[in-house]
């Protein structure tokens, strides 16, 4: 391969390629009518919500997503819809303030999506954008070091789709 051609790929072209790669990776779930949430855990593992007999759960390591992040995010979306701001969670104790819930990270940027998007659209967009932003940071870092875009994209994929990162998003 001609190294001169590789070096002529611009940063913006690399970012567009990265956006296409992230969208392509998530396309089967997003365009297939699925959600990027561990709802199989809820349907099989959690009583009294288990609506079907126990079967093999695809990824039991991300149970926090179903037991904590989904309900917290649902409460936040309901608060945005009813109050117009991130306010009160009526589902815990006798009600608690959403900004006090540090596990939820209520000031995190992706929670603001719940204010103007439907719940599952905001949830999926938040996850896609987290992967995109992680890779974008790596692209900018590696490109600032003078590394050609194909290798920069390899670095973005390696960082963004690192197993520990995937498991906790």
Residue ranges with predicted function:
Residues 2-16:
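N-terminal membrane topogenic signal
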Residues 8, 18-21, 101:
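Generic N-terminal initiation segments characterized by hydrophobic and/or small/turn-forming residues
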Residues 12-16, 125, 152-157:
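Hydrophobic alpha-helical transmembrane segments
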Residues 13-28:
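Hydrophobic alpha-helical transmembrane signal-anchor segments
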Residues 24-138, 157-169:
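Membrane-interface coil-to-helix junctions
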Residues 139-161:
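Transmembrane-helix signature of polytopic, membrane-embedded enzymes
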């Amino acid at each position: 391969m001609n190294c001169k051609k590789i070096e002529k790929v611009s940063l913006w072209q690399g970012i567009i390629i990265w956006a296409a790669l992230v969208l392509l990776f998530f396309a089967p779930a997003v365009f297939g009518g699925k959600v990027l949430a561990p709802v199989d855990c809820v349907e099989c593992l959690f009583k009294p919500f288990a609506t079907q007999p126990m079967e093999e759960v695809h990824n039991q390591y991300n149970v926090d997503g179903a037991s904590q992040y989904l309900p917290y995010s649902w409460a936040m979306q309901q608060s945005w819809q009813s109050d117009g701001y991130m306010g009160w969670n009526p589902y815990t104790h006798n009600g608690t303030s959403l900004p006090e819930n540090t596990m939820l990270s209520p000031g995190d940027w992706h929670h603001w999506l719940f204010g103007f998007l439907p719940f599952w659209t905001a949830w999926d967009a938040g996850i896609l954008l987290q992967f995109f932003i992680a890779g974008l940071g790596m692209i900018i870092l590696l490109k600032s070091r003078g590394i050609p875009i194909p290798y920069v994209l390899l670095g973005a994929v390696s960082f963004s789709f690192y197993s520990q990162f995937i498991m906790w998003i």
